């Protein structure tokens, strides 16, 4: 039971900026970490729904500014780890270099032109989606559930897809995960969330 609690803490420590108690980064504590990855999405979803409800219904904030706030909530909760990965991947894939060079680009901390373009498109699309959904309570709920579902799919991908490198963070998460348990839990969570939508 202790390793399950430690896996929960490890998931929040790695994938969010939400303060969590200290946890040792060892194989036992990372065993079920991917099972709890969607709970970071739960935190984002609940916060997004609450902010949308309070600022939209009670404060009656101007819709465009509310859409801006809803767009940046995931970045504040996660510290931007998901955006960082997207932008690194965009730079690497858009380089059209050989595999080894693309892997070097993934590790490079500098943002290239394609990363900046991808970031602009990413945030504009999110802003547009939120602006369109404001006033539609069901739409905001569905978007909030989507934060959990996307993390279910990401967790499944970490576990079952081939890794670009054998020594990276994702490879370590996959190697230390209880593969069958994590995959089954994530698939069941995804299915339950899909029904809930």
Enumerate the predicted regions with their spans.
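Hydrophobic alpha-helical transmembrane segments
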Residues: 1-79, 94, 98-103, 115-197
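Divalent-cation-assisted or electrostatically stabilized phosphate/pyrophosphate-binding catalytic cores
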Residues: 106
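Selective transmembrane-helix segments that form parts of the transport pathway or gating/packing helices
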Residues: 110-113
